[in-house]
Design a protein with these regions (language model features):
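Generic low-polarity alpha-helical segments
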Residues: 1, 40, 51, 65, ...
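Accessory terminal helices/loops
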Residues: 1-32, 139-148
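Short amphipathic alpha-helical surface micro-motifs
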Residues: 23-26, 38-41, 108
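A short, structure-level motif marking secondary-structure boundaries and short turns
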Residues: 16-17, 71, 98-100
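Conserved beta-strand hairpin/beta-sheet module of binuclear metal-dependent hydrolase folds
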Residues: 30-96
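Alpha-helical context
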Residues: 12, 16-19, 35, 65, ...
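A generic structural signal for short
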Residues: 20, 44, 77, 102-103
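Active-site HxH/HxHxD metal-binding segment of metal-dependent hydrolases
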Residues: 80-82, 86, 90-153
Length: 153
């Protein structure tokens, strides 16, 4: 390294001493939303574990008769999350329809309600093939006994 190269770590505080500054107060886990930018809503869905929520976003698209919302991630497949989705759709989207669902990956908190949301609101799902088929495979029961190829794998 050259003698005059800047020390990129000089301004980084020691671990455990830094504090995070958020530009917005988080939404309550009660179907409240925070508009983080025009047409971008942030909401939280509850999770019954130490990490007690998942962040979910709604993206407004289009104008006039084509306007609607895309969901990014779903929350858990629980009755509480389903009830919150019903309330969000009924009260927080300016009367506009859902247009689609994007699941970022297959984890149960990000895609747990994919089937329910797509069926309930007749919207398409966008997800990579790899994530979709991994999610499907994890949800399937293996035949008894397991096929030889799986045993050898």
């Amino acid at each position: 390294m050259a003698d005059n190269a800047p020390d990129l770590h000089a301004s980084v505080p020691p671990p455990g001493t830094e504090s995070i500054v958020y530009p917005f107060a988080p939404p309550a886990p009660d179907a409240s939303v925070v508009e983080v930018a025009p047409g971008i809503l942030w909401l939280r869905m509850p999770m019954p574990m130490q990490l007690d929520h998942i962040n979910i976003y709604l993206l407004r698209d289009g104008s006039g008769a084509d306007a609607g919302w895309y969901i990014v991630d779903t929350g858990l497949n629980t009755s509480a999350c389903k009830a919150l989705w019903e309330e969000v759709v009924a009260t927080r989207l300016d009367g506009l329809p859902l247009k689609g669902l994007v699941c970022t990956h297959f984890h149960y908190d990000h895609a747990g309600l994919a089937r329910w949301l797509t069926d309930r609101y007749a919207i398409p799902l966008w997800m990579t093939h790899g994530e979709f088929f991994t999610m499907r495979a994890l949800g399937e029961r293996l035949p008894e006994p397991a096929p030889e190829g799986l045993v050898l794998f």
